[in-house]
């Protein structure tokens, strides 16, 4: 079992952070940054209790899970796997969500193939899942 742990002091806010992983699981916790770009080829990507204003995340084969993340702009992509977001009020975002093969569940409502919402708040989420589901809960 190989593990790499990078610790950033609590009072530090990063300008940007980028991490790429070919195979394995990436866990990002308690990060504060203006922008973040995370990519996993095969494995899971979990981001929790973080504030990343402009977040880009991509997973080729595996899940992306965001929990209690404060972001103004999210660009998320999953080729084969699911996208799960909890602790986010989707009604405050202009949203463009799409799945090719799977469902989209926003709070208690289920949509097939696409979901759009224009909140006019300046916050946005763009998410595309090729094969899998998108689930967003408050």
Kindly give the residue locations of the regions a language model identified.
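Right-handed parallel beta-helix
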Residues: 1-53, 65, 116-138
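Short, surface-exposed interaction patches in beta-rich subdomains
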Residues: 47-50, 54-138
